[in-house]
Each structure stands twice: as C-alpha cells, then as structure tokens.
Amino acid sequence: MEDKANGMYKARNIRGFCHLSNGQEAANVGLIDSISSRDVICDSYRMHGIAFLRGKYVRSILGELCGRSSGSSRGKGGSMNFYSKDNLYGGYGIVGSQVPIATGVAFAMKYREDNHISYPDANDERRIAIGMYGDGAANQGQIYESFNMAKFWNLPMLFLCENNLYGMGTSVERASADARFYMRCHYIPGLRVNGQDLVSVLCGTRFAADYVRSGQGPFLLEYYTYRFLGHSMSDPGLR
C-alpha cells in the first residue's frame, strides 16, 4: 500500500504532505495484535499502516490521500489526519499534539470507571489509551506534562515512542542529550524493544499493555525501529 502511495504521489495523484512508513511494518502489526479493539489509539502523521490495521480498507486510505469523498475522513484530512470510529482518534499533523489528547482520553476512561459511569464487568477488560509519537517529538514539553498528569492520576495510559532514529533529517544523537527515550520519565517504568522484530514487539507490547490494564498506572514503551524512506515524499533522492 505504501509503495502504491509512493507511485501515486510521483504521478501527482496525491498532493501535499505524505509520510510513508516503509520499514516500520513489524512495529505496526505487533502493536495492533497486542491490544484490544476497544483500546484507543492517538497516532502521529505517519499512520497509514495503523489506519489499515485498525480496519480501514486500502481503497478508503488511498481515497483519503487523493482527497476524495470515499476517503476515511471524506478526503478532508489527507495523509496526516486519518480517523476511524474503531477507536482510532487521529492522526495529528502538529508534532506531539496527540500525546496530551491521548492522556485526556485516559483520564476520561479512569474518571468514568471511578464514578461507575462505565465500569468493566467480569468478562470485560479495562480499556487503555495509547499515545504514539516519534523521536522527533520526544523533546516536546507537552509530552512531559502528559507524563506528569498520567502518573499523578495513575491513568491507563501507554506512551509509545516510535524511534526510527531520525527526526526529519536529523539523527537522534544530534538532537537529544539522551536518546534512551524509554528512560525519559524516572517515575514511569519504561522498556525498549527491537521494532524491526515482530516477536520482540509482540512480547514487549503485551507486557506493557497488561501492566497498564492491571491498574498500575502509565507505561513508557520505545520501539527501536527504522524507516527505509525519507521523512516525507518531499525529501529529494530518498524516495
């Protein structure tokens, strides 16, 4: 699907922003297979694979990229702003903005449960929220604010950093004093897994999701992965 989008962009059937995730397939598949369909995902702008795995048809994804009404967001969102009623609350184009939104979703989940507005029965797992962000967004202040709020209220929140080693064209070593993103919050437990290995992603994500779902509070998970293409289709020579 990403290769098709690549070709359609070069043929000028797709305009504007387009961020492909070639190389990060194991991370996407492992995540979706490790969580419940009732869990809420707030993703960044590199999210075509997540949209597909959350139930969107290839036709609706490519339609969205082409700005057609058959697209998943009626053609108005484009590459960076997918949405699905199946607990996929975007794609967000503003770097890091999805993390406080996911934290707010986690707060709502806990508030409703604590006040018996929506309480899981014996056969129903507790829901969690997943806030996905990249290494380029990891230095955003709003993410640290979200860390604090999530731990202060012990929210059912999984912070998920997809570290593909480059924020646009800048390597993490040239932008971060400490590139161990899973250790960024000393009061939230963290784990790094090999994002290129499906089994590693499955084991690590299931462990993290079970921790959050058990009511112990937030967890910080890092996928150490790599994208095979440039930051976006606007990167010359990297397509």
Where are these predicted regions, by residue range?
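Glycine/aspartate-rich loop-and-adjacent alpha/beta segment that forms the canonical ThDP
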Residues: 211-239
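Active-site flanking residues adjacent to catalytic metal/cofactor-binding acidic residues
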Residues: 134, 161-162, 221
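A short, conserved beta-to-alpha structural element at the edge of catalytic cores
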Residues: 153-173
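Phosphate/diphosphate-binding loops
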Residues: 198-200, 204-212
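Short gly/pro/ser/thr-enriched loop/turn and capping motifs at secondary-structure boundaries
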Residues: 49, 165-168, 227-229
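Structural signal for short hydrophobic segments within the conserved structured cores
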Residues: 189-193
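Cofactor-binding active-site loop characterized by glycine-rich and histidine/acidic residues
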Residues: 3-6, 11-153, 171-178, 182-187
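Short glycine/serine/threonine/alanine-rich loop segments
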Residues: 155, 188, 217
